[in-house]
Structure formats: C-alpha cells, structure tokens
Amino acid sequence: MHTCFDQDNVEQFEELLLEVGDRCRDYSGPVRAVILDWAGTTVDYGCIGPTEVFRRAFSGFGVTVDDEEIRVFMGLKKIDHVRAMTHQKTLSGRWRQVHGRDPNEQDVQDIYARIEPLMMDVVTDHAELIPGVRNLVTALRAKDIRIGSTTGYSRPMVERLMASAAGQGYKPDTVVCSTEVSEGRPYPWMCYVNAMTLDVFPMSAMIKIGDTVADIEEGLNAGMWTIGLTMSGNELGLSRREAESLAPDDLSSSLELIARRFRRAGAHYTARGVWEVLPLIEEIELRLSRGVRP
C-alpha cells in the first residue's frame, strides 16, 4: 500500500522533525520522569527474594550455587540470568559432576521452568518497601515528575509484587517487564517503552535508578541520567538489619567498592538508597538548566 502526502503534509512533517530534533539537542528543562527498578531499589532490601529462588531452582537439579554466582548477573531477564549462570566455569563444572555433561539450552529452559512458580511463591514474602520510597514518591508527584519502572520479573511475578507495593503506598505510573520487549537489560527497550507510555521526551529528561550494573547500562544505553544504589540492593546483598549491624568502617569500605563499580560502569551518581536521591535529582536539574546532557 502506498501513502500519498500533499505538500502541506510534507512541510508539517518536516517542521515536526525539526522541532523534535531541537528539543532533543537543546533541552534545558526539568527532570520529567524517574524510572525505578524493583527488588533492591524500591522493595526487598538486599534483593534477597530472587537470590533465594535461584538457589532453590538449581538445588532441584542437585547443583549448589553460591550468592556471588547468582548476584553477578542480577538485573537481567530471568531466563538470561539462568543462561549466564550456566556459562560460569565453576558452576558448569559442578553440573558436570552431577549430570556427567555440561549444562545445555534444554537445562536452561528446565531450570527457568522451576524459577517461575518459585518466584510466584517467594516474591510477596520479600515485598516490603525500602525506606524512603514513599517520601520519594510524594516529592516526585509534587514536582509533576512521572514514575516508571523496569524489571527482570515476568508480568505474573510483578503483578503480585505490585499488589503488595500498592498496599504500602507505592504505585508507579507504568511497569515494563523484560518479557514484554525483545531484549531485557542492558538493552534500552524497557526504558523506551516507559518513555512512550509516560509521554516523556527527550530521554535526557529522564533518570534511571537501580541497584545493579545492568540497571546502569540500561539507563546509559537509553540516553538517560543514572543513579546506582550501593546499600539497599543486590551489590551489598544484605538485609537492612544485616547492613546496619556492620561496623561503620566495614560498611563504608564495602559501599565505596560498590560505588566504584557503578562509576566504572558509567553511573552519573551513586547513593546508598532511594532515601538519598532527591538532592541528586535537584543537581541533575541544575545541570540540565546549564545545557549539560547525560
């Protein structure tokens, strides 16, 4: 089918392209949207739930996995996470001892098939809001900043989480799952869907906040500002009680190592948790007003 445009339509389209291009290149307005991760960022201090599920799923096949083998890939789409774990030399070696061969793609599918129902059972046990979430939401609403989210959870998983979070006062404007786009993190597609759904443009008017390197890479690939959370999430990997019981010097050293990791990944800013991000949003707005882009 061929579409014909008259001269007026062509001129209007060209004007629109120029307007959009100018807005993108010269944007100096306020932050218009914040895109938040879920586990380790807004709920489940320490990102404990997913770690427990991966451990139980592999145990069902007679293979033990440790926290580091799980957490290094946190933030990816869950099936991609499983696949990446099976490619680890030490883990594949333990699999070989049990099964007499290296893990293959069918094994990845079989492990993931166990993860889905396990996650459905566990996710609501780890749905408590992280301190600062409600205050952040209130402040963002007051500034007319829209709230989106991206997650490695599937839609059935996150719907249970959303219900628990809503009961505690957190309800983002939109939720995009990695299973709803062609590729999850570090690809930017979930952020782009958020932008379209929220009707926010340009991407430099948006901030991605998360607790994994994959979150940072996702935001950077989408052309957004990024804030990495060092204490509340996957990288430290401790519950709130465990984290707060650490000796101050030990905690400070651990958080600095995590912050360096995020900065190496390209994060514009780091914070211990969402309770510290409001001043950073104000600083980003100041930089935007001066013509700085992410």
List each language-model region with its residue ranges:
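N-terminal helical cap/lid subdomain that shapes the substrate entry/recognition surface
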Residues: 2-20, 24-134, 138-143, 159
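A structural signal for short, well-ordered beta-strand elements
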Residues: 74-75, 151, 270
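Asp-based, Mg2+/Mn2+-dependent phosphohydrolase catalytic module
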Residues: 1-32, 134, 138-139, 154-294
